[in-house]
């Protein structure tokens, strides 16, 4: 079997918003990589066995006291090193060059002039011209003097060093962001570093990952039984399909129907996994328990905790009935692992705690099986398609863990959840009919707990308000509201008001992120 982890790249993260994008681009090339904090234990960096190291961008200034630096072991390793943005600046500063703060930040599109050919830039062209490349900049500081042994390979009208290299040492740096699609030749630059300079084979493919994970799961669990909390979401669905392929009927899935799922989602999950794929699925109808626990609770964080804790409680009850189960499978994915890792210095902040990472009751003496923990979401989707799951399921828009519980503002009631699920289904149905679903990154309805005056027949009526939300985004860190056609919005509004008793008004959310978040709670 192919060892897909032999050739790998290590990315040291200095806190840039684009770091995960670097990793995703390298994975797309077909090479495995991991993201570690810049201050990770140097001995572990040496022991990782990378074929090359990338230094990411970051928000700090190399001119500030205590600015993050790459461990000296990186430069002593003899490995190729590629610094991006802040990564190039610290590369220069640490190796005897100089950096300085610019009078003003450079952010957005720029053109760089290639002035010397090296392994990355040789023969590279795009429509900006033979020696001019369209790139994406996002920086304040810049390199003012390259270190000894380095050559300037690219410049711009505003900065003297847009790229530099020391070919003898195989050290490279660029001030711009090759991982961003606006840098037209960015993927080619990354491929040249990873494949040509570092010598990595492109073994990281969906088929190879499935083969690798099946072997790992079989080795890990042996003849033991495994249980999985199946939510209907992409991650747990792909885990179910993968484990079923690996261990067959030794897998039992527990599907907790909270009453806060998408319209008819419970029936769809059972049809797909239990009936179509032959997976053992226990369905727990727990809506009554959820609505009882959520009664009178309006604080969003309190709702999240109640929903999460009750899921664990119910799952615990069901797992106790499965005496032979020794392993718990989870849909943890790589961003969960990164965000929960943090940094020993506190320079990299723990963004949030994840229900998939460290959220299990301590008395649950089950081993963990996490076959997706090395994968980004786009890779999980590709695996799902490779495993035979329907594209409509695998490429569905994101759905929050607490479900409709955080799309109902304020207190959650059964009648609100039923209205919202139906309104949401109408919105999604119309998006698909108009061929707009795949053109939006996320679209959903929100229940507003306010009554607005309307006219029903000849009478005034005070009824509920539904908000529609649709956004376009690449990474979900920033998002634009989707400019859906007025006629389309009118059709959706008419259907919701006409088909749902109790709704008299539909509004459309035109807030971007930032300042708004994508979800309302």
Curated annotation (Swiss-Prot):
It catalyses: XMP + L-glutamine + ATP + H2O = GMP + L-glutamate + AMP + diphosphate + 2 H(+). Residues 204-396 form the GMPS ATP-PPase domain. GO terms for cellular component: cytosol. It is an enzyme of class 6 (ligase). ATP binds at residues 231-237. It comes from the Bacteria. It holds the Pfam family GMP_synt_C. Keywords: ATP-binding, Glutamine amidotransferase, GMP biosynthesis, Ligase, Nucleotide-binding, Purine biosynthesis. Pathway: Purine metabolism; GMP biosynthesis; GMP from XMP (L-Gln route): step 1/1. GO terms for molecular function: ATP binding; GMP synthase activity. The active site is at residues 85, 177, 179. Residues 8-203 form the Glutamine amidotransferase type-1 domain. Its EC number is 6.3.5.2. Catalyzes the synthesis of GMP from XMP. Homodimer. This is GMP synthase [glutamine-hydrolyzing]. It comes from Xanthomonas euvesicatoria pv. vesicatoria (strain 85-10) (Xanthomonas campestris pv. vesicatoria). The gene is guaA.
């Amino acid at each position: 079997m192919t060892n897909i982890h032999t050739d790998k790249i290590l990315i040291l993260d200095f806190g840039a918003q684009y770091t995960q994008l670097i990793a995703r681009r390298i994975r797309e090339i077909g090479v495995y990589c991991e993201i570690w904090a810049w201050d990770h234990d140097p001995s572990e960096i040496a022991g990782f066995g990378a074929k090359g190291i990338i230094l990411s961008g970051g928000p700090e200034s190399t001119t500030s006291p205590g600015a993050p630096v790459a461990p000296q072991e990186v430069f002593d390793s003899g490995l190729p090193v590629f610094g991006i943005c802040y990564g190039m600046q610290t590369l220069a500063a640490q190796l005897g060059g100089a950096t300085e703060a610019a009078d003003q930040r450079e952010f957005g599109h720029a053109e760089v002039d290639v002035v010397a050919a090296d392994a990355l830039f040789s023969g590279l062209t795009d429509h900006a011209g033979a020696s001019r490349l369209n790139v994406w900049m996002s920086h304040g500081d810049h390199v003012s003097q390259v270190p000894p042994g380095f050559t300037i390979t690219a410049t711009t009208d505003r900065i003297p060093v847009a790229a530099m290299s020391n070919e003898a040492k195989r050290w490279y740096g660029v001030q711009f962001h090759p991982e961003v699609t606006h840098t037209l030749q960015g993927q080619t630059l990354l491929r040249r570093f990873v494949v040509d300079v570092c010598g990595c084979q492109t073994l990281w493919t969906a088929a190879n990952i499935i083969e690798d994970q099946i072997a790992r799961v079989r080795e890990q669990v042996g003849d033991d039984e495994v249980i999985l909390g199946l939510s209907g979401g992409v991650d747990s669905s792909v885990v179910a399909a993968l484990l079923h392929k690996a261990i067959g009927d030794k897998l039992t899935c527990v599907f907790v129907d909270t009453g806060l799922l998408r319209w008819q989602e419970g029936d769809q999950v059972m049809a797909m996994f239990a009936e179509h794929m032959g997976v053992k699925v226990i369905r727990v109808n727990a809506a009554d328990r959820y609505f009882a626990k959520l009664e009178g609770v309006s604080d969003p964080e309190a709702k999240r905790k109640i929903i999460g804790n009750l899921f664990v409680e119910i799952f615990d009850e069901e797992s106790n009935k499965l005496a032979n189960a020794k392993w718990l499978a989870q849909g943890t994915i790589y961003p969960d692992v990164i965000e929960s890792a943090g940094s020993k210095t506190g320079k990299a902040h723990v963004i949030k705690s994840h229900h998939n990472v460290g959220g299990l009751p301590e008395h649950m003496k089950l081993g963990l099986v996490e076959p997706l923990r090395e994968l980004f979401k786009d890779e999980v989707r590709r695996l799902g398609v490779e495993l035979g799951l329907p594209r409509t399921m695998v490429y569905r828009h994101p759905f929050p863990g607490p479900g409709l519980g955080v799309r109902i503002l304020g207190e959650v009631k059964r009648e609100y959840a039923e209205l919202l699920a139906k309104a949401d289904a109408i919105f999604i149905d119309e998006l698909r009919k108009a061929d707009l679903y795949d053109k939006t990154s996320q679209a959903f309805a929100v229940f507003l707990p306010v009554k607005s005056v309307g006219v029903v027949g000849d009478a005034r009526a005070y009824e509920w308000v539904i908000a529609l939300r649709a956004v376009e985004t690449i990474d979900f860190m920033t998002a634009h509201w989707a400019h859906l056609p007025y006629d389309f919005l009118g059709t959706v509004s008419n259907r919701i008001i006409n088909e749902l008793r109790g709704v008299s008004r539909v509004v459309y959310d035109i807030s971007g992120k930032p300042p708004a978040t994508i979800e309302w709670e």
